[in-house]
Amino acid sequence: MYRIIRVLTELGVTKIRLTGGEPFVRKDFVGFLEMLSFNDLLEAINITTNGAMISKHIPVLERMDKIKHINLSIDSLQKEKFHQITRRDVFPEVYKTFEDLERSNLNLKLNVVVQQGFNTDEINDFVALTQDKNVTVRFIEEMPFNGKGQRDLKENWNYTRILEEIKTKFDPKPIISEISSTSKNFSIKGHKGTVGIIPAFTRTICGDCNRIRITPVGTFKNCLFDDGVFNIRDFLRNGASNNDLKELFLKLVKEKPANGFIAESNRKKGNVSESMSTIGG
């Protein structure tokens, strides 16, 4: 992975995100972060965690200048519901991780997947956290990456519905975000933090997307909705040089679909059916 990232930075990539589940489950992960920090072409290293194993590493992360943002996945603020959604009985530990990160000098975002029948009644509880905490709460439209294929569209809470729910208790004002931002962001008067909504399923942000993804098994993805366009791991194992890698990346990026609907329609296996744990994120 270090080699892949080095090649990508030589092509102009300046920001990366390392994701889980929980990337800190790898015993060598902190050492890997330290290695990446010496890449002079890399400006920002961001991390997504489920909160299981990051807490003890927070002091080290605070000392790494290139660690910019930590995204904590937390879909409920209620212990029993959290257990039901995640199948992990670790809510007290994850909430303590949230508190530890919020007190640190790291920029913290909470990722909340809005799921019909599970946590839609907690949307404004999450928004309320931003009143006295300098965090960004980002609500994510539920995507079909559940290992079972997508549910009926009528069941999904989309961007508009989520925003309407927030407006029942708060007065969110749009914030101008950078062009490639995945979320539509809002401020609320008197709140230290902000709120964002990621239209991941309705895919209204595709036109500005500049992201690529490499899965845990080495598959290169131009879009979350494609089924993987090339296996980088096998390419490297077959002796590819760094120049070979550069040529490959340039070729693959040129084939990036205009939006997620096109990517999904091009899938060889039909509907999206992987889980996010197999994709990575």
Predicted regions and their residues:
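Radical SAM/AdoMet-radical enzyme domain recognition
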Residues: 1-18, 25-140
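Glycine-centered flexibility sites
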Residues: 12, 20-21, 51, 76, ...
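Auxiliary Fe-S-binding modules of radical SAM enzymes
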Residues: 131-132, 142-281
